[in-house]
Each structure stands twice: as C-alpha cells, then as structure tokens.
C-alpha cells in the first residue's frame, strides 16, 4: 500500500467520526428545540417546584390571616411602653413578635390536628389541611413542635436582652403557650364552651402585657385596661367562626358559646363585640385626646359585617372580621403613638 492510500484511509475514517458526532449533536439540539429537557434538569425543576409547594402548604396550614390577633397586641403593648417611657427597643419588639407569632402558629396547628382527630373537620370546613391530605398528621405535629421550640428560643433571648425578671417572663410566656395548646389539646377548652374565654384573655390582656413588660422591664396593670377594646375585637373573630360552624360542631358533639346562646343571641353578642370598642374609643377621644378617634374610621366596615352576619351569610366572615380587627388595631396603635405626652391615662 502506498503512503498516499494510507493517508486517504485515515482521512475517510476521520470524516466518518465527524459525521457520527455531528449527528448526535444535531439530535440533541433538535430535542432541546422541541422543549425536551435533559433528565437531570427536569428532576431539579420538579424538586424546586415541589419544595415551593410544600412551603406554601405549611404557610397556609398556619392560617396567616389570623395573625393580626397576635401581632396587633404586641404592637399595642410596645406603643404603650413607648408613650409612657419615650423609648423603643426595636430588637425587643421583633423578638417578642416572633415569639408570640410562633406560639400562635403552633396553636393553630394543634387546633387543626385535634379537630381532625375528633372528626370535626370535614370537606366543607374552612381548614381542610388534613381532610384533603394536603399534609399528613405527623407533618403537622413536627411543624407544631418546631414552632413551639422557636418560641421558647425567642423567650430565652428575651431573658438575656430584656430587663424583665425571669419569673415574670416565664409566667406570662408559658401561660400563653399553655393556653394555645390547651385550647384544643389536653383539656380542650374549645370543646367545653371555654374557648372564647381563653382567646379573650390570651390574645388581649396577656399578649399586650407581655409586649409592654418586655420593653419596660416590669409588670404593670395599665396595659390590661388598654387591651380591652382589642380583646373584644379579637374575640369577634372566634365568635363569628363558631357561629358559622354551629351545626357541624353540634353534630360532632362539642359545645361552644355560640351553640349555648343560639343564633339570635349569637348575633347580639357579635354586635356587642364589634361595636363596644367604638364606644370605648369615643370616650377616650372626648376625655383625653382626639387621636383616639382614629379607629372610628373603620365603622363602615363594621356595619357591613353586621349586615352580613344578620343575613346569615357566613362565607368568609371570620376572615373579614380579622381584617376589621387588623384595621382597628392599627388605628388604635397609631392613636396611642400620636397622642401628646401626658395626655393618656
């Protein structure tokens, strides 16, 4: 064989290899142009999407629309401390808010777990986290334990960065934590018509006193009095929820205040809880400072809720009542912050 023939053979083989490689590359490019994602990319995308959906599911299980009931008392207690002392520690406020939110969220999960275990939640319930198998019971338990642990860690941080005595901090914080669990777990205050009392105390005076004490370093009675209108507004959220679920709760064999008093008195009680705070704000505005009249701006929404409740259209009424609670609370906090020094009792 001549040297030229060898060179020709080598050239031909090289061309064949190039043809194979080009065919493979062309095929892969064609697949990508048709939207076919390589396997490793598809798996990564699915994992990322699944993680986002899981996070969204956990957030929804917390019922975030109800968090105004715990955030506003913390803001109110902090505002009272600021108005009385003239100083505000933002770090204390943030840690306190996270601690209270963690306990509130954990309490919501405990409520979800026990309502499902007792057969109270069903396909038409507002909370179908476990009914629709969005989460498994063990997922709810683990998430609840995590939130209670987070709350305790925040309480420990407050001990080191606040001047409040340990016994006072533990008394208020663990009192609130116990209430959030025993509302449906353990004793189950919700099931024996005592849930309204627990909510009235925990998400009113107790939370406001806790936030105030963390800022000033001691316990005081004054925040308890300021907490009354906010506590009534917060209780209206629970009462509207219990009135809506009256029939299903009765069939499940549990007793709530709404069941005890009946539809007519439930309507009257709801009006009392919604409108009595406005009377208190009017008295504060006329006797002390006009800034206390700010919450009166929400009266149109209150009358809208009254009409909806009277027509027995309970669709989304707990959420709308929570919105009213948020607005009333925010205007109340602004009213205290804007009040002239020494004008408040």
UniProtKB/Swiss-Prot annotation:
Regions crossing the membrane: 60-80, 90-110, 141-161, 169-189, 213-233, 251-273, 285-305, 324-344
Family matches, as CDD domains: PT_UbiA_UBIAD1 (cd13962)
Entry keyword Cell membrane: no
Domain of life from the UniProt record: Eukaryota
Metabolic or biological pathway, per its Swiss-Prot or TrEMBL entry: Quinol/quinone metabolism; menaquinone biosynthesis; Cofactor biosynthesis; ubiquinone biosynthesis
Membrane topology: Multi-pass membrane protein
Gene Ontology MF, one: prenyltransferase activity
Gene Ontology CC annotations of this record: endoplasmic reticulum; endoplasmic reticulum membrane; Golgi membrane; mitochondrial membrane
EC number: 2.5.1.-, 2.5.1.39
Subcellular location: Endoplasmic reticulum membrane; Golgi apparatus membrane; Mitochondrion membrane
GO biological process terms on file: circulatory system development; endothelial cell development; menaquinone biosynthetic process; ubiquinone biosynthetic process; vitamin K biosynthetic process
Substrates-to-products reaction catalysed: menadiol + (2E,6E,10E)-geranylgeranyl diphosphate = menaquinol-4 + diphosphate; all-trans-decaprenyl diphosphate + 4-hydroxybenzoate = 4-hydroxy-3-(all-trans-decaprenyl)benzoate + diphosphate
Pfam family, one: UbiA
Listed Gene3D superfamilies: UbiA prenyltransferase
Keyword vocabulary terms for this entry: Endoplasmic reticulum, Golgi apparatus, Membrane, Menaquinone biosynthesis, Mitochondrion, Prenyltransferase, Transferase, Transmembrane, Transmembrane helix, Ubiquinone biosynthesis
Similarity annotation: Belongs to the UbiA prenyltransferase family.
Biological role: Prenyltransferase that mediates the formation of menaquinone-4 (MK-4) and coenzyme Q10. MK-4 is a vitamin K2 isoform required for endothelial cell development. Mediates the conversion of phylloquinone (PK) into MK-4, probably by cleaving the side chain of phylloquinone (PK) to release 2-methyl-1,4-naphthoquinone (menadione; K3) and then prenylating it with geranylgeranyl pyrophosphate (GGPP) to form MK-4.
PANTHER family in alphabetical order: 1,4-DIHYDROXY-2-NAPHTHOATE OCTAPRENYLTRANSFERASE (PTHR13929), UBIA PRENYLTRANSFERASE DOMAIN-CONTAINING PROTEIN 1 (PTHR13929:SF0)
Protein name: UbiA prenyltransferase domain-containing protein 1
The species this protein was found in: Xenopus tropicalis
Source lineage: Eukaryota, Metazoa, Chordata, Craniata, Vertebrata
Gene: ubiad1
